[in-house]
Amino acid sequence: MLEKLIKNFATYMGITSTLELDADGAYVLPISEVVKVRAQQNADNEIVLSASLGALPPSADTAKLYLQMMIGNLFGRETGGSALGLDSEGNVVMVRRFSGDTTYDDFVRHVESFMNFSETWLSDLGLGKQ
């Protein structure tokens, strides 16, 4: 199901290159110069979108930024239903899961919303300026 959604989405976005799976089995969607969105299907048949937003700046007040992320995560209101966290290397990541049985129109809405919230958080946390 995901492969068909991805191919239709790539056509919709005007992506002419062939989308292939990365080493983790995820499609990397080249739809933004700033944020690369990965899409894959998990064992529970959910589609998982993820994006690495980068490392916090060395001069950052990490306690303040972690609090900002926690508040943003509360009820998904400031993340569009996604979750912010840190990966094993300390980079800020955003993740969103939804049913793999989604319609194409809903898939497009999920991806576009995820991109918008990812780019907003990238800016709000001062990432990508290093």
From Swiss-Prot:
Q: Which Gene3D superfamilies match?
A: 3.30.1460.10
Q: Which GO terms describe its biological process?
A: protein secretion by the type III secretion system
| UniProt-listed InterPro entries | Tir_chaperone
The record ties this protein, via Pfam families, to: CesT (PF05932)
Q: Please give the superkingdom of this protein's source.
A: Bacteria
The similarity annotation says:
Belongs to the chlamydial CPn_0713/CT_663/TC_0034 family.
What name appears for this protein in its UniProt entry? Protein CPn_0713/CP_0033/CPj0713/CpB0740
Query: What is the native source organism of this protein?
Result: Chlamydia pneumoniae (Chlamydophila pneumoniae)
